[in-house]
Structure formats: C-alpha cells, structure tokens
C-alpha cells in the first residue's frame, strides 16, 4: 500500500468547509488555477463532481485529466484523498 502525503492526511482529518481546491492532494498551484478557471474553486465543488461520477475512480481520473491536465499520479492522489474523506465524513 502506498503512503499518503501530509497534504492528504491534513485534508481527510477534518470537514472540508470552504477549503480551496488547492488543499486537495494532487492539486497544486497550476492545476488549482486551471480548475478555478473552470469554476471548480473550492474542494467541495470538486467533491460534487466526484459524487456526480458516483465515486468511480476511472471516470473521475479521466475527468480531472480533461479538466486540468492532471497526470496519473496527480489524479490518483486527488481521487484517493476524496475517497478517504467520503469514507470518513459521508
């Protein structure tokens, strides 16, 4: 099993509230700006897309690649972060 980043652990440790999209694991400044330009400015907006896609890993990773040019690691990290958050809080 792969280890998670500190950013991932910090995100899943508490409710997301109004956290920026850049607080998500796998999403840094560049990807965050690209998502913000498409209206995905908050982590909860990306969570909404994650839920619309029924938490499907492949669909979400494909969407993230299309939305902001995320690479495989970035999309995997973001998916894992949202999945673990959902497991803890939904």
Curated annotation (Swiss-Prot):
Keyword Cell cycle on entry: no
Function noted in UniProt: Non-specific DNA-binding protein that plays key roles in mitotic nuclear reassembly, chromatin organization, DNA damage response, gene expression and intrinsic immunity against foreign DNA. Contains two non-specific double-stranded DNA (dsDNA)-binding sites which promote DNA cross-bridging. Plays a key role in nuclear membrane reformation at the end of mitosis by driving formation of a single nucleus in a spindle-independent manner.
UniProt record similarity statement: Belongs to the BAF family.
GO biological process: chromosome organization; negative regulation of protein ADP-ribosylation; response to oxidative stress
Subcellular location: Nucleus; Chromosome; Nucleus envelope; Cytoplasm
Keywords, ordered alphabetically: Chromosome, Cytoplasm, DNA-binding, Nucleus
Pfam family, one: SAM_BAF
SUPFAM superfamilies found in the cross-reference section: Barrier-to-autointegration factor, BAF (SSF47798)
Main location per the UniProt record: nucleus
Name of the encoding gene: banf1-b
Domain note: Has a helix-hairpin-helix (HhH) structural motif conserved among proteins that bind non-specifically to DNA.
GO molecular function, one term: DNA binding
Organism: Xenopus laevis
Protein name: Barrier-to-autointegration factor B
Keyword Cytoplasm attached: yes
GO cellular component: chromatin; condensed chromosome; cytoplasm; nuclear envelope; nucleus
Organism domain of life: Eukaryota
Subunit (UniProt): Homodimer. Interacts with nemp1a and nemp1b.
């Amino acid at each position: 099993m792969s280890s998670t980043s500190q950013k991932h652990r910090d995100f899943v440790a508490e409710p997301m509230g109004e956290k920026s999209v850049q607080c998500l694991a796998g999403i840094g400044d560049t990807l965050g700006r690209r998502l913000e330009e498409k209206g995905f400015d908050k982590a909860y907006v990306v969570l909404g897309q994650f839920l619309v896609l029924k938490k499907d890993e492949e669909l979400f990773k494909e969407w993230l690649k299309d939305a902001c040019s995320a690479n495989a690691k970035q999309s995997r990290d973001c998916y894992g972060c949202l999945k673990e958050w959902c497991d803890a809080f939904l």
